[in-house]
Amino acid sequence: MSKFQHDVMLKIVKIIDLVMITIPFALCWELYYSYQVYAKFGWRGNWTMLGLFAVLFFLLGKVYDAFWMSLQRISELIYGQVLAAMATDGILYIVICLMSRRLCNILPGIAAIAGQVVMATLWAKCAHSWYFRTFPPQPTAVVYDVRHGLEKLINEYGLSKKYDVKMTLNVEECLNDLSLLDDMQSVFISGVHSHERNIILKYCVGQGINVFVIPRVGDVIMSGSQPMHMFHLPVLRVGRYMASPEYLFVKRLMDIVVSLVGLVILSPLFLITAIAVKSDGGPAFYKQVRLTKDGKQFEILKFRSMRVDAEKDGVARLSTGDKDDRITKVGHIICACRLDELPQLLNILKGDLSIVGPRPERPEIAAQYCEEMPEFALRLQAKAGLTGYAQVYGKYNTTPYDKLQMDLMYIAHPSLIEDLKIMLATVKILFMPESTEGVAEGATTAMGQETEE
């Protein structure tokens, strides 16, 4: 099957999904909400509302990976679909209330969401099953330089579930006989240096084989290069992260507005959480020194989730998640719901943090990272953030090297659109337990080393 046919079939399946998810909203609108608006809508107005719903659902669905049949589990598809539908319903409910000039009954909207959950479940199961029957996993080879991390790539990261991994080749084996790749439809290249990788790339492209490159830090830095012409030659200019003044101004304005609105809306939750933490013994808040842009130190403010003497020996440790006996009973709850992060809105308002940016690390842990990976200091080119690319698309226990690459990908391409996407995608991970997993038990220091007693 050609790529064109593949893409057309996928678009048809996505259109079916849009229609299925829109039907409950359409019934809700036609039977109830259309009669609540101040001015009666004609048929054009009704179709406009349905079109607005479909467009918003499609855009939010892309943010929440609601259509990614090839790489998402059925449960993840349903979760993304329902989240996108609920967000769209919420936006249009506000629009309807504004058009009605009053607060409308929310029960019909809840009924629509229930219908959308059923539709999303039905579509996800059918679409996922159809996809893998129609497009079985492609025969795939993995070419690697160092075997360390290969098992994680194939098994833990789910490569073997989506691709039919026929062989794993050391880069030397591959270069000795490139024809080994001839029967493959896809090749993953992991940790291979540029010279050897380019030889494999040229061969695969010539043979019409899809190539997926897991980049090194240098590749990520190069991705943000500026193409130009000098001396009658094509040149790529690579330099320090330099976002435009306009971008920085709008980003700071967005930080102020979002943090102020968040503090006002979440103030009741803020108060309840503070009382709950205080009742667990000890202060409600704790401050900790963190690093932001250019290595500047600041005190981050969080709700206390651990015992007061959690680091009485003075050793900086990462959390090991639910198994960490330093976390209090209330701490387990607020960490699972991310409520411990709420006071950071004050850091954002003050200007220490941004809404979106690399995770602010402790100086001691950052020093450990830099000792093993000098490139880690490149993260400090941008202001640290409450949420970020690595937090959204990785896990708490994703390797430091992988997190570094994710952060550098964000830094290399500053964009308000990307910031908005990350902010919206953050909602998705709030309710995903794996995103709050700690490091492995015993691996309590920054690089996964066990602390000496």
Model-inferred region functions:
Residues G218-D219, Y286-R326, L386-Q405:
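Short, glycine-rich, amphipathic interfacial segments at transmembrane boundaries or analogous
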Residues M1-F132:
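Signature of alpha-helical transmembrane segments in polytopic membrane proteins
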Residues E375-E453:
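C-terminal terminal-structure detector
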Residues Y247-A310, N347, L416, I422-E453:
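A hydrophobic, helix-centered structural microdomain
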Residues T320-K383, I422-L430:
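A short, structured surface patch at a secondary-structure boundary
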Residues M1-P24, K125-V264, E437-E453:
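N-terminal hydrophobic signal-anchor/signal peptide
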Residues Q81-A85, P137-K152, P283-M306:
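Membrane-cytosol interface motif
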